[in-house]
Design a protein with these regions (language model features):
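ER/Golgi luminal nucleotide-sugar-dependent glycosyltransferases, focusing on the catalytic module
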Residues: 1-156
Length: 156
């Protein structure tokens, strides 16, 4: 099956803080599984300065530098990005660097982020996601401070 990536990356002051670096490390670890479209929006506070060097963080992706809108954040560009996916026989992993506005990562958020990538992108879990999505299930994750959540939600 074709696996797409839509990724929203907010970089406060166009800098890669500890938390964003952690996200990037984990995303790059699993980059090889995305064999379809790879769309990345890098949101910055000042679109007028030269941020082109940030595109190097996401080689082999369709990367756009966009203005960060604190009220809408990742949802601002999600619909636009999902419309670019033309293959109906595919799945799309959507993620964003949760906590990217924080300079330092706390342990609870780090565990959540690690779980997000691991339980969605390790091969044995990707297979479960593919099977589940082909049976009219919705796949989602939510943040809870210390309690893990089940990734599968029945569509009814």
């Amino acid at each position: 099956m074709v696996r797409n990536l839509i990724y929203f990356c907010y970089l406060k002051n166009s800098e890669i803080g500890e938390f964003s670096a952690y996200h990037l490390f984990l995303l790059h670890r699993y980059f090889h599984i995305f064999n379809g479209v790879r769309i990345v929006k890098i949101a910055v506070d000042d679109i007028k300065i030269d941020n082109s060097h940030l595109k190097e963080l996401f080689k082999d992706c369709s990367v756009e530098i966009v203005q960060n809108h604190p009220l809408h954040r990742e949802s601002e560009y999600f619909i636009q990005s999902i419309r670019e996916i033309k293959n109906n026989n595919s799945i799309t992993f959507f993620a964003h660097n949760k906590g990217g506005s924080n300079i330092y990562a706390d342990d609870a958020h780090k565990l959540w982020v690690l779980s997000l990538y691991f339980f969605n992108l390790e091969p044995q879990y990707v297979e479960k996601v593919e099977k589940g999505l082909s049976r009219n299930k919705v796949f989602s994750g939510i943040l809870r401070k210390t309690v893990s959540c089940p990734p599968w939600v029945p569509n009814n």
